[in-house]
């Protein structure tokens, strides 16, 4: 019986501590700039645009626009 009460109290305390720390950290990120630059560099490396004069189509993206199969 004592062990059960101790376990219940311990679980309640741990739950309360998690809820308190979750409310305190809402809306804050420690390393916001690291995450945003990592995400940006990853997306830039997969979607680079092609320069003027290079061939373009459905799978390639031009920096300007695609006109008659060539980037302008």
Curated annotation (Swiss-Prot):
Record's protein name: Omega-conotoxin SVIA
Secretion signal, residue range per the UniProt entry: 1-22
Keyword field contains Transmembrane helix: no
Species for this entry: Conus striatus
Listed PROSITE patterns: OMEGA_CONOTOXIN (PS60004)
Effect of residue 67 to S: In SVIA-2 and SVIA-5
Function text: Omega-conotoxins act at presynaptic membranes, they bind and block voltage-gated calcium channels (Cav). In vivo, this toxin is a potent paralytic toxic in lower vertebrate species, but it is much less effective in mammals.
Molecular-function annotations in GO: calcium channel regulator activity; ion channel inhibitor activity; toxin activity
Record region (Disordered): 25-56
InterPro entries membership: Conotoxin, Conotoxin_omega-typ_CS
Location relative to the cell: Secreted
Keywords attached to this entry: Amidation, Calcium channel impairing toxin, Disulfide bond, Hydroxylation, Ion channel impairing toxin, Knottin, Neurotoxin, Presynaptic neurotoxin, Secreted, Signal, Toxin, Voltage-gated calcium channel impairing toxin
Disulphide bridges, residue numbers: 49-63, 56-66, 62-71
